[in-house]
A protein has these predicted regions:
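Nucleotide 5′-phosphate-binding alpha/beta core
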Residues: 1, 5-100, 106-138, 185-192, ...
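Glycine-rich His-Gly loop
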Residues: 103, 145
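Conserved adenylate-forming
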Residues: 46, 146-233
Length: 233
């Protein structure tokens, strides 16, 4: 993020009691030190109890008492029962935010989050990045299927947040070469990418002998799946 934007957020947070700062500190401690099995079990029990009281889908199954009783649901299962799964008081939780997958595995998926959940998601991500050396002002490239008019951001917001949109809707050689050129030309320092896209990019570099000596990349964050060993090299 731009420094001005970050400082503004920090001042606003401090004025409201430093909630986000405390959340980030808790996240860092949990990432570094871990959490106890008792804590995890207590949190899971609270979550299961909540959905059994507030979700029409889970209300129908009072016999489900332990995590093992709850069925594993695919994205397709959730989509089929989407309105039932949503908790009844979701509309009472203020502004809701939509988090969507690109559908690269065949099934697009969207979840709704309230403001508190979005704060936790963002602080967890920032905590993980900072623990791995991320610094304020670093220019990051976010790899995703950027769709104009749907999830793209303005040039001003891109500049303000030091965020470069790296489109991965096409992963052919021409597109991969363009990604390589953009990383070099725009002096991107942090890559935030899905493992599948990173695997394709590293495969292209290895296969073509593409020169990356002028890249300014210091950090790579991979999401989604485990990376093949060859990708690390």
């Amino acid at each position: 993020r731009g420094l001005g934007d970050v400082y503004k957020r920090q001042l606003l947070d401090a004025a409201k009691g430093g909630k986000l700062k405390k959340l980030k500190e808790v996240n860092k401690r949990e990432i570094v030190e871990g959490v106890t099995p008792e804590y995890m079990e207590r949190r899971i029990d609270l979550l299961l109890d909540y959905v059994k009281k507030h979700s029409p889908y889970y209300k129908k199954h009072p016999e489900w008492t332990k995590l093992e009783d709850f069925p594993v649901m695919t994205k397709g299962d959730f989509l089929e029962h989407y309105e039932e799964v949503l908790v009844e008081n979701s509309k009472e939780q203020g502004n809701l935010y939509r988090l969507s997958t690109s559908g690269s595995t065949g099934t697009p998926f969207t979840v709704l989050c309230d403001g508190d959940k979005m704060n936790r998601v963002n602080m967890n991500f920032i905590s993980c990045m900072e623990l791995n050396g991320f610094r304020l002002g670093m220019k990051r490239g976010e790899f995703r299927a950027w769709i104009k008019g749907k999830n793209t951001i303005s040039m001003w917001k891109s500049f303000k947040n030091n965020l470069i949109m790296v489109d991965i809707s096409n992963m052919g050689d021409d597109s991969l070469e363009k990604i390589c050129k953009d990383i070099e030309k725009k002096k991107i320092q942090v890559l935030v990418t899905y493992s599948s896209a990173l695997t394709a990019l590293t495969g292209y570099i290895r296969r073509t002998g593409r020169d990356i000596s002028k890249w300014k990349v210091e950090m790579v964050f991979s999401m989604g799946e485990a990376l093949p060993d060859a990708t690390y090299e």
